[in-house]
């Protein structure tokens, strides 16, 4: 049913409305690529390279961007741009794309590629949008020492910077935090924000919510989804 919905409603409508009947196969391939990369940083240029190297199809990045806009205009997907938290400015490319309906995404891939961490991230993004938040991908920077002893500027990511009115919440999506090393990796970007806005990590491996000694709210995924006032 969902696959039929894709072909008969979404794709057919995009093709007819934008008069690109001869490009339907390209649209199909683009949709497959986006379906396979939810929650991953990408841009039209990288996608065009994927067309060339993997699909052996030559297409320019401007055309890819235009077709992605068709998907966005049809409410099939949406994009989250990268935001420099301390610099208070948008970075631009690359960015992330999420499906408005995860079931449609899964059907598109014939229910393969069921990466639970990426699907969970998509679900959290959608729920934040439904609750009226504007959502960006947060970026913070630090100077870190590499294995050679040299220091360099390193970008760290906060999955979501959710803003509604005067409220701002930093959110990490973590399928599981099995050890302290993984927990520290997820928490580090929070410490780099340099502000006191609420910080939340949504996890699949816990049920009850609790605050750690850093003041970060740990919350179970189900708890977050069932309580619209959870953040």
Kindly label every feature range from the protein language model.
Residues 1-73, 79:
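Conserved helicase/translocase motor-coupling segment
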Residues 63-231:
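A cross-kingdom feature that marks ATP-driven nucleic-acid transaction machinery
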